[in-house]
Amino acid sequence: MVEAAARKGVTIEVVTFDESTHTAAEAAHALGAELGQIVKSLVFVSGGADDLEPILCLVSGVNRVDLARLAAVCGLPDVRRATAREADELTGFTIGGIPPIGHIRRLRVIMDPDLGRYEVVWAAAGLPTAVFPVPPATLRVLADANVAPIAEVTAAPSPGGGRSVVVEPASAPGRPATGTTG
């Protein structure tokens, strides 16, 4: 993974921990960072067993991927979350340590625009106990990612009570940054 970054002219500094950074919450706690600064590297697939099309989503730790939005962004009829075995076979890494780069095969990469709200984000570095800091613009280049809105849109309680309002992810045009999901 470090070599993959070096091939693109970027030096990354891997930070390791004794404790797990397997989940976004664990990583944020270990780093003393905001949950939104943690890059979740999530593998999705489309197609059948013989022709799986893998998609890697780089998602802010506060967001969840909306499958319908992801399918629409990718121009696919449907997508589903890859199994742990599929993710390992497609990337060469186990869930909880999947980095945004350095996979055993080329993947289509979609990046959550909410990551751009931060000066630096933290991505997995190949192990559930290792991460690396990277500016979002550099991450996009390293991963050869397309930036697209793939986060869920949720219903939040109305401040007045009773009725609910639709809350878009922070990156949606005209929406405040407080509307992200966890």
Q: Could you describe each region identified by the protein language model?
A:
Residues 1-182:
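Extended, low-hydrophobicity, polar/charged segments
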